[in-house]
Structures are given as structure tokens and as C-alpha cells.
Amino acid sequence: PIRTIMMGYLDQIDTDYDAVASELMAFESQVGQFLENPETSSMNAMRSGWLTAQSSYELTTLHRYFSELVLSEEDVLTLFQLQYQINHWPILPGYVDYVADYQDSGIVNDITVILDLESLRQEHGVFDLAEASLGFHVLEFLIWGENKDRQSERPASDYRAVSELTNIQIDNGLQLDQISN
């Protein structure tokens, strides 16, 4: 009976992580569709995909907890490092992108930071644990925005490519290729 329970649990682990992988692939596709066509409908589909993928990931929390009981100290540390990259909370929203009183804040608006995976990994927690640039909650902030009142979600228009500079940007000597697109 115990072996049957253990084997059943191992099967459940496989099932749960397969579900996470599947939901993440669907979410990645929705992100791609949104970036190709940044409209409200594609943004809503992407938001729905984030909710499904994140919920699926949260269902694996128990497996990570139990794995700590059987893994070496080194493997547990690796697991914590991965968890920090995947699902760290809380994050510092202004480190990632603009917030209400600081429209130009965040690494998204920092013209000295190249927005690619390598740079984002380097920026992740560089000065403080809350300065996350990776993971579900960073994506959540980028998708919904600050939205403190739960009624003013980030608009899809934030993701439309910039094709001309504002007068302030021109006065500051910026070039179009320096603007986040």
C-alpha cells in the first residue's frame, strides 16, 4: 500500500509539472500574439494565460516543499535560487517599469540596459532581493501595471512601438533607437 501511494504521488508530480510546462507554452504563445498585435483583446488573452500558468505553477508548491526533505543541501539551495527567479514576491514595481508618480522609472525605461535575457538575469536582484527582473510577478506587473484600485489596468497601447520621439525626448538628445520598443 505505501509503495502504491508513493508511486501515485510520483505520477502526480509528473502530471503537475507537465501541466505547468503546457500552460507556460500556451502563455508564451499568447505573449507572442499580443506583442504582434498589442490590442485589448490580445492583452486580455495574455492576462488569462498568465493566470492559468501561474495557478498551475502554484499547485506544484507542495512538491517543492517535500523535495526539500530528500534533497542535498546543495540541491535545496539550487531549488531556492530557481524559485527566486521564477516566482519571487514581493517585487519592487518601480524597478521594473513606470509607476504613477515616476513615469520614467524602471529598467524598461533605462536606455543603458539592453532588454534581453542575459541583461535581465544580470539585473535580477542586483542590489536588493525585491529588485526582481524575472518571474511570474514581474510579468504580472508588466501585464496589469500598478492597478492599485483594480480598475485601472495597464493599457495595451503601452506596448505599441514608438515611431517618433516626443519634444522632451528630442530636447534631451535621445535617438529613436534608444527608446524601449
Question: How does the language model describe each region?
Answer:
Residues P1-N181:
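Mature extracytoplasmic or organellar-lumen-exposed domains after removal of signal/transit peptides
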